[in-house]
Amino acid sequence: MTNPTDNPMVEPLIREFIARNILLSDTGFPHSDDVSFLQEGIIDSLGVMELVEFVQETFGVKVEQSEVTPEHFDSVTRLAAFVRRKAAAAESSAS
């Protein structure tokens, strides 16, 4: 499990997961970090569920069903920011 609060590897890990597990590509994530997964047809509803599981297992953050929205899961940038916010909130509540 990776501590994502200040980890620069959050975006690369997300890109790699999407490339390998959703796009089934060995050549990497072929889009910019701000590209909308939904508008570009990169991820469907099943892919979103895979992404939720990946985030929970890789970064150790709990994702509530109500948080699975385009605001949080529609681009690498948005997802990385969400992961960092969740990790920071978990750290502050554990203190």
Q: What are these regions, as identified by a protein language model?
A:
Residues 22-42, 60-69, 92-95:
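Phosphopantetheine carrier-protein modules
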Residues 52:
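Short-chain dehydrogenase/reductase
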Residues 67-78:
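AMP-binding/adenylate-forming catalytic domain of the ANL superfamily
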Residues 49:
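Conserved catalytic core of two-component sensor histidine kinases
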Residues 4-8, 42, 70:
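Charge-dense, low-complexity intrinsically disordered segments
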Residues 2-30, 81-95:
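Thiotemplate assembly-line natural product biosynthesis machinery
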Residues 45:
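Catalytic nucleophile serine of serine hydrolases
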